[in-house]
């Protein structure tokens, strides 16, 4: 399920828009994730106390974590599928320490696409959305394979 060179170019063009404001995009992705799937908030001891969107928007820690998440994902996307070195430590921590299920990775993938679409509608049309969806699916599938190697049934 690889992506063509053209699809990777669409993904990386869209990601360039994200990188122009990683903290802002990351914060919005996490807020959208937590609002759409409140059960995901329980995985974040640091953010469990944030009950309203206003509290989430005011949290510098949430903004920082959003930036961390999107920076790591950006480093993976830039490898165009050749992301073994970047993926291994991420899968290790998410399987053994954080216990983040593949389903939660699907939820955050949806949030990422929704945020890019809402912030950059003119630059993130149907083809770019489909390409990003494929890239994030590749990421999730590879995370799931690593989880399996680690004995995590997430």
UniProtKB/Swiss-Prot annotation:
The modification Phosphoserine is found at residue 4. Heme b binds at residue 94. GO terms for molecular function: heme binding; metal ion binding; nitrite reductase activity; oxygen binding; oxygen carrier activity; peroxidase activity. Keywords: Cytoplasm, Heme, Iron, Metal-binding, Muscle protein, Oxidoreductase, Oxygen transport, Phosphoprotein, Transport. The modification Phosphothreonine is found at residue 68. It catalyses: Fe(III)-heme b-[protein] + nitric oxide + H2O = Fe(II)-heme b-[protein] + nitrite + 2 H(+); H2O2 + AH2 = A + 2 H2O. Disulfide bonds: none annotated. GO terms for cellular component: extracellular exosome; sarcoplasm. SUPFAM superfamilies: Globin-like (SSF46458). Residues 2-148 form the Globin domain. It comes from the Eukaryota. GO terms for biological process: removal of superoxide radicals. Its EC number is 1.7.-.-, 1.11.1.-. O2 binds at residue 65. InterPro entries: Globin (IPR000971), Globin-like_sf (IPR009050), Myoglobin (IPR002335). It is found in: Cytoplasm, Sarcoplasm. Monomeric heme protein which primary function is to store oxygen and facilitate its diffusion within muscle tissues. Reversibly binds oxygen through a pentacoordinated heme iron and enables its timely and efficient release as needed during periods of heightened demand. Depending on the oxidative conditions of tissues and cells, and in addition to its ability to bind oxygen, it also has a nitrite reductase activity whereby it regulates the production of bioactive nitric oxide. Belongs to the globin family. Monomeric. This is Myoglobin. The gene is MB.
